[in-house]
Amino acid sequence: MRLTPTERDRLLLFGAAELARARRARGLRLNVPEATALIADTVCEAARDGRRLAEAIAAARAVLGPDDVLPGVADIVTEVHVEAVFDDGSRLAVVTDPIGGGLGDQAPGALLPGPEHTEPEAVVRVLVTNTATVPVSVTSHFHFFEANPRLDFDRAAAYGMRAAVPAGSSVRFGPGESVEIGLVPVGGDRIAIGFAGLVDGPLDAPGAKEEALRRAAACGYLGVEQR
């Protein structure tokens, strides 16, 4: 018997669903693969019977309840996608909340958000002007002193500082745009390596700031002169 890959997948799904039916008949509560297979197979069989997409999805939602599955399964299987062949062609059926009765935040292993992190208040505010013809973005933990050379701001005031924005975010400066931004000191060991190469070591080492300003001036950075 020659089968297409789609037909082989259908037989695999049917086999898993039959196993789920047999275990359910023995009084066992289904796990995630078993529940998923049974729900998906119900859609495919409804399509084979000539039922429409909405009817197939409704049948899949009715096949299992919270008491038919192991604890936590309803919170894991929140959506099942399966491609089934209907009378008018192949359709992707999306069965949302197929089991119902999920415990939400009370489910075993649920991920709960921690307390909201409050960013520190800015200790320095500088006016930044983007003189470039393209937008410039600076990420939260970039040493702001070493930001794009075409950004015009008080570099000396920004030495050892980063943008006072949430971690992982960035601040964007449009072409010709002037924006006042708050800065906070770089934390931790205060060692800057990489970035634009203006600093390569401890930020607070003797002479480090003066050397960084000299390098910035030599490389044509705007805003090197303290205003």
UniProtKB/Swiss-Prot annotation:
GO terms for cellular component: urease complex. Signal peptide: none annotated. Residues 1-101 are annotated as: Urease gamma. It is found in: Cytoplasm. Pfam families: Urease_beta (PF00699), Urease_gamma (PF00547). InterPro entries: Urease_beta-like, Urease_betasu_sf, Urease_gamma-beta_su, Urease_gamma/gamma-beta_su, Urease_gamma_sf, Urease_subunit. In the N-terminal section; belongs to the urease gamma subunit family. In the C-terminal section; belongs to the urease beta subunit family. This is Urease subunit gamma/beta. It comes from Streptomyces avermitilis (strain ATCC 31267 / DSM 46492 / JCM 5070 / NBRC 14893 / NCIMB 12804 / NRRL 8165 / MA-4680). The lineage of its organism: Bacteria, Bacillati, Actinomycetota, Actinomycetes, Kitasatosporales.
